[in-house]
Amino acid sequence: MERDIYGDMADQHIPVGQGVQIRFIGDLKENGKPRGKRSKQDSYGVAVRVQGIDGQPFVVLNSGDKAKSSFGVQIKSQEPYLNASNTSPPNYQNYSSKPRGPSRSISSESELPENPYGSRGYRPSSSHYSSASDEEQKPRGNIRGSDGLSSLPRPLQASRREELRRSQSHSSLLEPDVEESYDYDHHYSERSSTLDTTYSQSSRDSAWSRSSQKKIDNGDYPSLGYRSATSQQSTSVSNKTKKNGLSTSSPSNQSNEDIDTKPLSSVDSLINKFDIKGQVRGRTARRSQALKDERKRSQSLDGRKNYHDTADSREIIVEKQNEVQTMREPVNASNRSFNRQTLERGDISKTRLTKEWLDQDREEPVILKQQRTVQSEFQLKSTPDLLRDQQPDGSDPTREMIFGILREGSLESENTLRKKTSILLEKLPSLQVQPGEDTISLGSQKKELERKVAELQRQLDDEMKQRMKLETSQGRPKAGMQRLEIELEESKEECSRLKELYEKKKNELSAMSQELMEVRMGKEQVETKLRTMEDKLMDSKEELSHLRAKGGTSPDKLALLKELEEVQDELDEVLQIRQKQEELLRQKDRELTALKGALKDEVANHDKDLDRVREQYQNDMQQLRKNMDNVSQDQLSLESERQKINQVVRNLQRELEESSDEISQWKEMFQKNKEELRSTKQELLQMKLEKEESEDELKETRDRFSLLQSELAQVKKGSVDPGEVASVRKELQRVQDQLKQLSVDKQKVEENLQQREREMSALKGTLKEEVSGRDRETVRLREQLQSEVMHVKKENEGLAKESRRIQDQLKQVLLEKQRHEETVHQRERELSVLKGALKDEVSGRDRETEKLRERLEQDALMTKRSYEELVKINKRLESEKTDLERVRQVIENNLQESREENDDLRRKILGLEAQLKETNTFCDDLQRAESRLKDKINKLEAERKRMEDSLGEVADQEQELAFVKRDLESKLDEAQRSLKRLSLEYEELQECYQEEMKQKDHLKKTKNELEEQKRLLDKSMDKLTRELDNMSNESRGSLQLLQTQLEEYREKSRKEIGEAQKQAKEKTAEAERHQFNSSRMQEEVQKLKLALQELQVEKETVELDKQMISQRLQSLEQDIESKKRVQDDRSRQVKVLEDKLKRMEAELDEEKNTVELLTDRVNRSRDQMEQQRAELNQERSRGQDLECDKISLERQNKELKNRLASMEGQQKPSVNVSHLEAKLQEIQERLQLEEREKATLLSTNRKLERKLKELNIQLEDERLQVNDQKDQLNLRVKALKRQVDEAEEEIERLEGLRKKAVREMEEQQEINEQLQTRVKVMEKESKRKPIRPAHDDDLSSDGEFGGPYDPSSITSLLTESNLQTSSC
């Protein structure tokens, strides 16, 4: 008996429960200390991947592998169901399972960890058990059939710590393991493939199985507690399995377990939807029985046997049961009633809904049929309701201990004993410490916040993509941009708010985890108490055994037996109540499984959406890189064009400098010529003075001659004295000498005049040459200007096209254009003011020239009038010449020649004055034209520089706008998506939360009812507390071991994740190295590594960084707006430059006209010079005639003197004296007239000289004014150059700021990428963590007292977070 009890305790050493039993197995291999017999063939891997919207898990089971250590689920193995007689092994050939090829999951294994457990082949099984459908799963007992021979000893079960294996993500669970051998002589084990989430009666079933084992060993035939759905069906079904020679144990007859097995249609439909999917994530096929030494119990929580999913397999099992029933003796009435009930249930189970569901399960997709042709006959249904109801072959140790104590020395039936044990165990859960209800709510809130963050991120991505599309087509209007900015700000605020909530909930979760640890500590204390109670039970057993050994039936013993019978009755009643409650719980669990199936579909869709978003993100990044390459190429082309324009401008500046040097040289030459002309004018004035002096002397001689004549007249009248005659002769000689001297002086003056005329002709030749050279230079300059203007026009046209293209792309930059236009308007106003001043100056010069022309015309009229008068005088003199003699004629000719010479001189002077004026005006016009051209060239250079700067800034702005727009659009898309997701998930979570609250209320009511019943079992609880304490100590040790293993696994997973992150970063770095220089990329990689380390250490700085990023984004947006305005202003400047070019063309045409007028003036001046030369020749001829007249007059004087002498010698007045006197008077009158004419000519000459002086003064004033204006223009040019230099410096500064902003944007993008990776990591961690609070209520119930969970379920919950990483 002690062997049996301790064997049971060894079998029960594994803490079991009614949830998913998960264990680490690496510790056993590492330590090399196996803890008992184990069967690696029956270990299964479990991968729980939480990717649902509300964090609900779905399950993927993978078969184990001997090679690798992993997490797994230890699932119950079945023993053969044989009768006690020594019968031969059954014929398994007809039901042997064929080895099947590997059936892989649909999900790719590249994304998930490798399955360390290869799928194994199924051993041939005599009874095909499969997973029961959720509507057909009812409480059933575990069959512990005896061996083929009753004499064989019962082997101990596998030790408490079975070696478990890590689950693979989506590897097949249906691959056959051909390596394992098959033994027909021994029992075979069927590999368990069911992990059901429904609750079952594991404790009672295990107790029944142990009692049946003991009764079989003793030769009795107790009822075997086989409670599968097929065994509960009718035993009167046609006996098809007799043909195959199968023998099974008969179903146990229980009258007290009437359970409703009607299927739930709504749950069935959901499960049907879930199971038709092509992706196989559920349990494997049927179990195969192994040898008893290799047998290992599953860890399901209800210990149910597996079911076939088809009706035929159920009929086969029923037939096996009938065969066993025919071989056994009839059992009591309760068993018969149970058979009747199972028949009714079998009839109900084969309803239309169940058949449709089974038929649908048999219909697989075409792809899976092709993959699984070999295993199509044995393929079983896989559902996500597999995490519960897995239990080892023996039930929990407390139940077995209580059952063994009650069974010792009792004569009651086994059912009553089991009912009493169940009642005792149901009274115990009040000792447990239950955690608060806030854990589930906090977990759900945390999941909700995480989903909201993910949804916001997705919406931001969507919005960024939409904005990218809009940007490629056309720039969006300003209103849309503002609206998007407002939405972005709102989404940022919502993100910050959600993050705050996330942090808050995280803190609350940490507090709740601490509370959970306290609860676990309380649970461990309860377990220690249970162990002490077990010790007490063992002591009581020993006492009973001693009493039995003594023999006899004492009255104490009878009293104890009666008490035990009463306790058994109470236990039976409590078991019935508990069965009803478990049925309700199973129904709710089925509904939960259906919801899990729907969640699985949503998770798959979510994965697809994530893959699609990743692909789209990669495409967007590639497009971004292409756009960046195009922009860089455009920048290079613009820089080359800019350099060309700079070269052209420099060449123009050089040519301008050369032309300015030439103009300065010409001006110096002109000033020298002017000075020479002035010197010549002074010499002419001196000559005129000398001439006046000679004329005065002539007047004096004439006066003397008149005195002589008067004296002659006196002599004629009176007596002529010889002394007076002698004196007269002396006087005449003296006069003649004076005349000779005057003639000599006159010749000298004429020679001087000729010399001056030669110098003037030479000067005129030089002036003509200078004028012709100046004309050639002006023509050359005009041609150069025209060619440069054409080149500038072409360049401006190209720039205009480029600016139009840029304007099409940057229509949104309006404000900056307005500012630029204002500056352009100011410059235009200044130019208009300058133009007005220049026009006023030009108009003043024109007025002055008109005044000078009028004066010259008046002078010409005066000269004409004087010339006409002289002509008249000449006509008169010619009329008088006929009366006069040859002397007279000679004198008249001399006088005419002198007049002509005077006229020629006047004309020459007037021509020279006109030439001087024209040359002065021409020089002034040239200076003005040169100044205008310089101003225009300077303006064009400044405008070119501005255009170049504007183009550079436009290119930079394009890049910045493209980056900013893409970032904003991606963020807005992600925000919108996240908002939508969060709204949907929030509604779903509210519904789930309401349902869970309802379930909690219902559970509370049931708990209150159980607490009322607990009072009846207080006495028995005192005895069992010690045993519970011992058990809690053991579970505490196991939990600590599990926690250490969890920490090791977490460290491993973190290392793997870090390695994966490093690999991803290296790949991204390699992709960027192809685009940029290797040096930059290395620095950026180092920065990224440092940033990652800082981000991992400093979590709290993320929010501050995001705020700074938002502020930077706002500042960048403001900069972008200002740059848009500048771009608009620059485009307007381009238009203004085009208008200015047109104006300059018109001005060039005007200048051409002015040059033509100047050439006409030059031609006129040449004609005037020729006329002056002719007049000079005429004056020379006149001078010669005057000299001839002088000679003739001298001869006449000599003749007169001779006559006077002859007259004096004769001393008699002759007749000719009167005639001579008359002639003398006429000559004197003529001389007087000539003197008058000379006086008038001198006055006119003096007036002309005064006018010349005034004109020279005016010319000098004008020259000074022109120089002043030139200096002012030079100052303006220097100021403009300074402004241009300042503008260039400002542009360089802006370029530096732009580069800095680009660097900051790139750094911000890197930070955002790091944040995204960090958020993903946090999401993964949060997906691992929320499972614990979701199951806190489950942990609160003590599975070792018959509740839904036990310490093993705690380990499963602790390892689920790590299993996520393996599946991911």
Curated annotation (Swiss-Prot):
Residues 116-132, 200-211 have a biased composition (Low complexity). Residues 9-378 are annotated as: Interaction with TJP3/ZO3 and myosin. GO terms for molecular function: actin binding; microtubule binding. Residues 1331-1368 are annotated as: Tail. It is found in: Cell junction, Tight junction. Residues 377-1368 are annotated as: Interaction with myosin. Residues 101-294 are annotated as: Interaction with F-actin. It holds the Pfam family Myosin_tail_1. Residues 290-312, 1320-1338 have a biased composition (Basic and acidic residues). Residues 83-97, 228-256, 1352-1368 have a biased composition (Polar residues). Residues 150-295 are annotated as: Interaction with TJP2/ZO2. Residues 9-435 are annotated as: Head. GO terms for biological process: microtubule cytoskeleton organization. Residues 71-264, 278-312, 1053-1080, 1163-1183, 1308-1368 are annotated as: Disordered. One of its GO terms (cellular component) is myosin complex. Residues 436-1330 form a coiled coil. A motif (ZIM) lies at residues 41-55. Localized on the cytoplasmic face of tight junctions of polarized epithelia and some endothelia. Keywords: Cell junction, Coiled coil, Tight junction. Probably plays a role in the formation and regulation of the tight junction (TJ) paracellular permeability barrier, possibly by linking ZO proteins to the actomyosin cytoskeleton. Parallel homodimer. Interacts with TJP1/ZO1 and TJP2/ZO2 in vivo, and TJP3/ZO3, myosin and OCLN in vitro, possibly directly. Acts as an F-actin bundling protein in vitro. Deletion of the TJP1/ZO1 interaction motif (ZIM) decreases but does not abolish colocalization with TJP1/ZO1. Belongs to the cingulin family. This is Cingulin. The lineage of its organism: Eukaryota, Metazoa, Chordata, Craniata, Vertebrata. The gene is cgn.
